[in-house]
Amino acid sequence: MKKNYISIFSIFTFVALFLIGCNKQEKNILKPNVLFISIDDLRPSLGVYGDSIAITPNIDKLAMDGIIFTDSYCQSAVCAPSRASLMTGIRPDSTRVWHLGDKFRELKPDAVTMPQHFSKHDYHTVNIGKIFHNYMPDSVSWDEPDLRPARYLKKDWLKRDGETFYISEKVNTSQSIKRDSLLKIKPIRYADGWNTGPAWEAADVHDTMYYDGAQTKLAKATLTRLAKMNQPFYLGLGYFRPHLPFAVPKKYWDLYNPNQIPLAKNNKIPSGAPLYSMNSMYELRHYDGFSNIGHPTSSYRMSEDVIRKLRQGYYASVSYVDALLGDLFSHLIKIGIYDNTIIVIWGDHGWKLGDHNSWGKMTNYNIDLKVPVIIRYPNQENRGVKTDGMIELVDLFPSICELAGIDVPDYLQGTSFVPLTTNPELNWKHATFSQFHRRPKVSADGKRYMGYSINTKKYHLISWYGWDSETGTRGDFKSNELYDKEFDRFETQNLADRLDMRDVIIKLSNQLSEGWRKALPEYTAQNLIYTDSKK
């Protein structure tokens, strides 16, 4: 009898464990995968965003199977602050990441990033490429952090060495010499890979010979492996182009005739804008042949031939990444996981291509703040639609959580925009909020400032203050910039000094002071919680 009891008990236990395992497996299978794609320095220069020059058939095709957000803003127009805000779901004044060198994990050691949160909900999280800032892959966030193609794992290379950008042996020899020299002079600064060479390259090679192509090949192999797991995955895949240098295969350069690419329509700094509003172009200045370019506020003018070459390089880089994504999406279909995968494409900030007599990001102007966001998810009701509802990159964390059906942390400072995917015409946020820290070494007058930006549908207000970098607090008010987006979408004329704009500035200044919570869509759960807490 005792033996029978043990036998029956063993069978019961086995069946129970089997059923639990099946339930867990079934639960995981039902969860959608997440493919989270960052494209560095990508402004909305895509066909689906109305850019008639851009050749981006694959991104456009995905957009026709998803939703396009046409009025999206980053929280800060430079890599580290923008990405730290997006990935933690909190804003720059909360992360305290204000410029490139700030490392969010040192400033916020207990921060729970988006992939960490997904990992807590039984997702297997993997990182390939640039999701956080270059040399800050944040191994804490991933089950498999910072995977790289095998040929880029050389012991003597820096974390993001300049030699990973180029094909030319001559250039790479020069890069190696430069790297070793810089490490001797400033070992701490250059240990993370601050090593630049030519601003462009167009080698006649296969796509996989450049880094982005090699990591796409790795991503395909990784996806094949992940598809066989009985667990949903979150893959963060970050592309380096179209960030400088514009080093991509020649065939993508050949897609564009530089003489047929129109020049920037707003090639002057905004009239009436303060000098410290503009970036110094120090990013471009680091590349060969550009060390002597002037500040945008000076009389310096780049030659038209060079302007066209740079613009051609940017568009070629965008088309290169587009082709790689086409290959990646075809692979998702081939291995049978496309239908059950949330795909997100986002740019971390915009980029000036001669706009405002400048190159690069690092301003509070909308040419730098506006970004593309495209999302495709399983069982989506509306496909191929656009919404002009205002969203922010900080909204991605709660939105992807909701789409995946997992809990949304209540401390996040973004708002899930999932309701816009079911009703693109929904009356949404009243405003978006951004900021930029202007450091003395790159400001026109050698002083330090913080500019706070609020965008509404009609206006864009930028308020500048002095800034105490030690305490992280604003000082005295310095100036305002006001732009009428309806009549001046290229932001050419600062209206802040006009008497008839005083009431507008007062209203917008109050909105800016009240902050993001007061700009929430009506009747969202987040808004109701905030309102109730104020009673």
How does the language model describe each region?
Residues 2-9, 13, 22-474, 478, ...:
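Formylglycine-dependent sulfatase
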Residues 482-483:
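Short hydrophobic beta-strand that contains or immediately precedes a catalytic carboxylate
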Residues 487:
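Extracellular, beta-strand-rich glycan-interacting domains
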Residues 525-526:
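Short, glycine/acidic-rich hinge or "gate" loops at secondary-structure transitions
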